[in-house]
């Protein structure tokens, strides 16, 4: 097995998620410590949190807000957000983001109040 992985995100399927739709690279590999997602946030996302995962968001397109533990923070392209485990969060508005979960995304670590 090579010492690298390659993903063509434009060839990955869109998957429904609490934020809209996502394409997830490296989420199904046991060899990754992180995954990379391109997320199209269609509407206001559903508030959720993670007990284990840290997430790093990078806004690519759109102007909106992130709700972080109840506080609304304005975001625009090239805004980066570091979301630690336990932080209740959601995007507000139509955005396109890159999401890097660490460790790699696990749908069992997605919690809703």
Can you describe what each PLM-predicted range is?
Residues 43-45, 79, 87, 95:
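Surface-exposed loop/turn positions
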Residues 52-64, 69:
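Glycine- and acidic-residue-biased ligand/ion/polar-headgroup-sensing regions
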Residues 35-51:
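Conserved short histidine dyad/triad with adjacent acidic residue
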Residues 1-34:
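A short, N-terminal "cap"/entry segment at the start of jelly-roll beta-barrel domains
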Residues 37, 60-61, 76-77, 93:
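A cytosolic small-molecule/anion-sensing beta-strand core signal
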Residues 70-86:
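Short acidic-glycine-tyrosine-enriched beta hairpin
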Residues 23, 66-68, 97-99:
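Short hydrophobic/aromatic-rich beta-strand segments that constitute the beta-sheet cores
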Residues 85-110:
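Ligand-binding loop in jelly-roll beta-barrel domains
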